[in-house]
Amino acid sequence: MKIIKHSFDGVIVGAGGAGLRAAIEAAPHMKLAVITKLYPTRSHTGAAQGGMSAALANVEEDNWNWHAFDTVKGSDYLADQPAVDILCKEAIDAVIELEHWGLPFSRLDNGKIAQRRFGGHTVHEGTSPAFRACYAADRTGHMILQTLYQKCVSMGVTFFDEFQVLDIKIEDGVCQGVIAYELATGDIHIFETRAVTFATGGFGKIFKVSSNAHSLTGDGPGILYQKGIPLEAVSYTHLTLPTNREV
């Protein structure tokens, strides 16, 4: 076993949809590494089939305010409402951005991105169902991963695939790096950095019943919790898809 040191301006832990998108945003501004215990296109984002919701209004009248209303209502009014507003406003540009990067969305006869109804989405604040979910056949999440990963590769992002993060290094209250285990060799890698982003996904597989991938074991939140870093809303986790009333 060897101990290998690396130096990067920033490190992202996790290479699902969130981690890859964060890498695209950060890569032009810093020397960046993405550490992932899976090959990026195997991440659980690929399990999402139904679509990505955005008020494009390609099929019928729609706007982001109605999307925000549905999102807050769907959270039993517990969601951070300013964050919901940002999500629903920026979802429109995010879908168009993915289209420009090459995501093969399904299309309407007029060539626009196809949209379909999906649970809980309405127009006029609950009056009738909305055509809001933008989709790529039945493999939307898979195509999102492929598109984001291709974009990262084209930008020269450095990936460390099949590396299990073990710990973070904190000195004087400041994160100084990440310690990871290379699965193929058993070598320990120390990543010295001044910025770390955790995008390790959910933790449904700590429960007996879950449709989450077997890789979703809560490694990231567990590491942070052990270091005394506060976690937010850990009681809200997605156990199954489709969503069920009883498990």
Describe the predicted segments one by one.
Residues 237-243:
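Conserved small/polar residues in nucleotide/adenosyl-binding loops
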Residues 10-33:
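N-terminal Rossmann-like FAD-binding beta1-loop-alpha1 element of flavoenzymes
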Residues 99-187, 192, 199:
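Conserved redox-cofactor binding core of oxidoreductases
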Residues 1-10:
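Extreme N-terminal leader/targeting segments of oxidoreductases
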Residues 83-89, 133-147, 211-215:
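Short beta-strand to alpha-helix junction loop
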Residues 12, 16-17, 39, 139, ...:
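Residue-level detector of alpha-helix initiation sites
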Residues 54-86:
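Glycine-rich active-site loop/strand segments that organize a redox cofactor
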Residues 28-47:
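Glycine-rich FAD pyrophosphate-binding loop
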